[in-house]
């Protein structure tokens, strides 16, 4: 079903966000659906709390270079490893 949609913006949560693995989740079904929507959208927004930064879950949703925005409550030191030219990091809760 997800492959029929071409959203301008896809907003998803992740169990882990890591420079090498990108955005990841623990469930195969969750990953399959999120990966399909993420791949079909013009921009991808990933939400991940500070405890999920640097963590790698079992299944990849998207590579870091394919994420447009990361919304997190992580500190500057926690997000330093994730910064890139393509990724805009939005810090909340400070």
Predicted regions and their residues:
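Conserved phosphate- and dinucleotide-binding cores of soluble alpha/beta proteins
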Residues: 1-94
């Amino acid at each position: 079903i997800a492959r029929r949609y071409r959203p301008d913006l896809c907003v998803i949560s992740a169990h882990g966000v890591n420079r090498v693995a990108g955005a990841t989740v623990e469930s195969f079904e969750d990953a399959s659906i999120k990966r399909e929507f993420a791949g079909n959208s013009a921009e991808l927004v990933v939400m991940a709390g500070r405890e999920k930064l640097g963590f790698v879950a079992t299944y990849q949703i998207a590579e870091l270079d394919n994420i447009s925005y990361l919304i997190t409550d992580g500190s500057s030191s926690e997000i330093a490893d994730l910064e890139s030219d393509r990724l805009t990091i939005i810090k909340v809760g400070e």
